[in-house]
Amino acid sequence: MRAGHALVLFSGGQDSTTCLAWALTQFAHVETIGFDYGQRHHVELQARQTVLAAIRSRFAQWRERLGADHMIDLSVLGRISDTALTRDSAIQLSAAGLPNTFVPGRNLLFFNLAAAVGYRRGLHTLVGGMCETDFSGYPDCRDDSLKALQVAVSLGLGQRFTFETPLMWLDKAATWELARSLGGQALVELIVRDSHTCYHGVRGVLHAWGHGCGTCPACVLRQTGYDRWQARPVAAP
């Protein structure tokens, strides 16, 4: 068990749910923070509450460690962004070579605001589900970006903050395996049934890997990782 308390950037998706479970195994007290930034679908905001309630009810070993949840109104980001996550537009590559699901400044703002909350509540470890292995090239998911931001936040607030990114060098198959190692099949089932990833907000169809349209980049990445994880040989006991 590590010293100190942690604040998890928690969206209700697969990655942030896995990171929340990771934090609950590492720290004696963990709080969560989410952001309403004007995303097209509020399904993920509903999934946040479902996942948090499920963790409290199904995982006795984590129940007492899971503290307050903080929801931040960041709707201004949606108003100034013109992306497929904040507008009703088709997903495609932009002229810069990035998918138009990239919301400029999103993770930078998330960490800055999380640090402001953490400063007030004595939560100096911030945990995020960013990843360089299976990702869409978002510059604010890169390890270098987050390390630079960690330094800037620590200097700007006059306190030492640590940004933890447990998934940074894992592919999606390894993320599924990490979830299993943290919470067993119960956590895998929670992620499948209760977390949300689909860019189109589809919840009516439950696949082996979870709810979703099955065709958007987020669903394809999640399904591919799940299939690869399932195809891996089981280690001998």
Swiss-Prot record:
Q: GO biological process: what's one of them?
A: queuosine biosynthetic process
- What Pfam families has UniProt attached to this entry? QueC
- Per the similarity annotation, which family is this? Belongs to the QueC family.
**Name recorded for this polypeptide:** 7-cyano-7-deazaguanine synthase
Protein task: Catalyzes the ATP-dependent conversion of 7-carboxy-7-deazaguanine (CDG) to 7-cyano-7-deazaguanine (preQ(0)).
Question: EC no.?
Answer: 6.3.4.20
What gene name is listed for this protein?
Answer: queC
Return the broad EC class. Answer: ligase
Q: Which cofactor does it need?
A: Zn(2+)
Query: Which species is this UniProt entry from?
Result: Verminephrobacter eiseniae (strain EF01-2)
Residues that bind ATP: F10, S11, G12, G13, Q14, D15, S16, T17, T18, C19, L20
- Could you tell me which CDD domains the record lists for this protein? QueC-like
> Which residues participate in Zn(2+) binding?
C198, C213, C216, C219
